[in-house]
Amino acid sequence: MQKFVWKVVCLENKIAICLDQQLADKTSPVTEYFFWPQSDAWDELNKLLESKPWITLSNRIFVLNILTDLINYWDEKKSFDQSDWPLLKEKFPDVVFIYIK
């Protein structure tokens, strides 16, 4: 299975989510940033992943499941802040959270 790294920028009323692929000790961007809840990040990411033939169906499902978990968690809280850091890192170990105030 390919290794992916999520980047989540936590803004005031939304999150921006992008996906990178881990290549040895470096990462390469797979997607641009998708904003939630401003747009349907899940649907946009799904369409983009479908257009990349090198991403297998099992990897696409894996990635979309993580995105679903991120979106659902954010929807419950309506925000992420630095006080959430320990729980977020435990729940989402492959996600890099960036806080912007």
UniProtKB/Swiss-Prot annotation:
GO BP terms in the entry: translation
GO molecular function, one term: structural constituent of ribosome
Highest taxon in the source lineage: Eukaryota
Pfam (any one): PSRP-3_Ycf65
Compartmental location: Plastid, Chloroplast
Quaternary structure, from the entry: Part of the 30S ribosomal subunit.
Record's function text: Probably a ribosomal protein or a ribosome-associated protein.
Family designation: Belongs to the chloroplast-specific ribosomal protein cS23 family.
Protein name: Small ribosomal subunit protein cS23
Organism: Euglena myxocylindracea
Gene: ycf65
